[in-house]
Amino acid sequence: MKKILVLEDEENIRSFVVINLKRAGYETVEAGTGEEALAQLKQNPGIRVALLDIMLPDIDGFEVCRRIRAMDNKIGIIMLTARTQEMDKVTGLMTGADDYVTKPFSPAELTGRVHALFRRTGGDEELEADDEVVQPPFRLNTRNRTLEKNGQRVKLTQVEYGIVKLFMENPGKALSREEILDAVWGRDYFGELKIVDVNIRRLRIKIEDDATNPVYITTVWGYGYKWGG
């Protein structure tokens, strides 16, 4: 059974989330503080997705997200944000989250986002016949879901991996934000297009020699992005 960490300090919200995730067939691990969540991750290595509230009584959800990313880049992370806090969404994505859900949210929206994230993190994928994509100086191993630049490993989240894979398999092709969203997040994802832009910004910091002057992931103004100038 797929295991999810639920970090939420308000017990009624946490119970609502847990009940609906269990109804959808997921196993849950609960935490009410950031430190408790980090401890649960160490005790439960089978956790593949984490739902993180931002406002917590000890360390906030952003710091928990940073620490999770330092421990494991393969865990999918969804931030639970207030609808009015636009900067929380951007900050969460830049600290390593894969997605966000704004409060209040419906059970269908929450479970849909979780299901889509499990799919993107590779749990439901079959191994591919061609296990390497090479675009110098990059080498993408689709079997291990890893990226190297000049022989050095680049640490990617699973969403970042999906974006790089899409670009490297379509070199020189302009891809719209909508195409990227559909390919990486899935056609059933109904989030905002800005999630593409924020993930591209984060990805450039990791793979470009100068993120302010990108040469690998370039902008196609008014449309989207492409691999190469």
What are these regions (language model features)?
Residues K2-K3, A116-A174, E178:
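Short, Lys/Arg-enriched segments at the junction into DNA-binding effector domains
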Residues R69, F118, M168, R204-E208:
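Protein kinase-like catalytic domain
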